[in-house]
């Protein structure tokens, strides 16, 4: 059973890899199932053992690729936290966002694919296997819990941050308009701080030092 399951995983991974290559080169609308199986060197019937249609492949790829970006960003943040102490949870959130942006900056094809197709539902339900299968939302939540501040409507707050980053970085990274990404970051991160402050609960003790 182990070998059989391993072969199944390999076939599914090969189909996903082939589809990702074609989707990023041609777009999903211009890619057919026949082209995917040809690229993966498999029979067309094999495709339907794993996926209902190419849209299901797309959803799987979006979740997988975004998952990897977030996983690497979280690992980078954790490494930084081992090396130094940060005074606020806001700085931790910004470091996480910065790690995500830097990955997308280095991989424009990935940015095009994720930004065009990543819905809030997909993002909020993504699970990171290497982090005990936790939701991406759980990672944000764990950062917020490190703070002695309390936040209201945390899901809405995170939604606003994610959508802000997604909307502002796309044209800046891909088309370099209206500014370069390094110039955008300063104002973007200040806006993220403002969002976090806006959602602070009135019960938070403003005089208490915040540790992250």
Across the structure, where does each feature detected by a protein language model lie?
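Alpha-helical DNA-contacting segments of helix-turn-helix folds
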Residues: 51, 58-72, 114
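Helix-turn-helix
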Residues: 14, 22-56, 60
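Hydrophobic/aromatic-rich alpha-helical bundle segments in the mid-to-C-terminal region
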Residues: 112, 145-191, 199, 203-208
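N-terminal positioning helix adjacent to the helix-turn-helix/winged-helix DNA-binding module
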Residues: 4, 10-14, 18, 157
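Secondary-structure edge/capping motif, primarily at the C-terminal ends of alpha-helices
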Residues: 76-84, 111-118, 172-176
């Amino acid at each position: 059973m182990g070998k059989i399951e391993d072969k199944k995983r390999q076939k599914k991974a090969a189909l996903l890899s082939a589809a990702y290559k074609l989707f990023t080169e041609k777009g999903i609308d211009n890619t057919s199932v026949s082209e995917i199986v040809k690229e993966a060197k498999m029979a067309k019937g094999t495709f339907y053992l794993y996926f209902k249609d190419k849209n299901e492949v797309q959803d799987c790829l979006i979740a997988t690729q975004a998952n990897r970006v977030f996983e690497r960003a979280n690992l980078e943040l954790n490494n930084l936290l081992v090396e130094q102490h940060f005074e606020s949870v806001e700085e931790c959130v910004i470091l996480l966002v910065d790690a995500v942006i830097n990955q997308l900056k280095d991989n424009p094809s990935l940015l095009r694919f994720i930004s065009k197709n990543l819905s809030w539902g997909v993002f909020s339900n993504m699970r990171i296997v290497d982090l005990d299968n936790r939701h991406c939302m759980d990672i944000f939540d764990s950062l917020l819990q490190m703070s002695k501040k309390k936040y209201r409507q945390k899901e809405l707050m995170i939604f606003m941050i994610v959508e802000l980053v997604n909307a502002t970085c796309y044209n800046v990274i891909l088309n370099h308009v209206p500014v370069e990404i390094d110039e955008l970051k300063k104002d973007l991160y200040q806006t993220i701080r403002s969002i976090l402050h806006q959602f602070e609960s009135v019960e938070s003790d403003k005089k208490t030092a915040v540790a992250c």
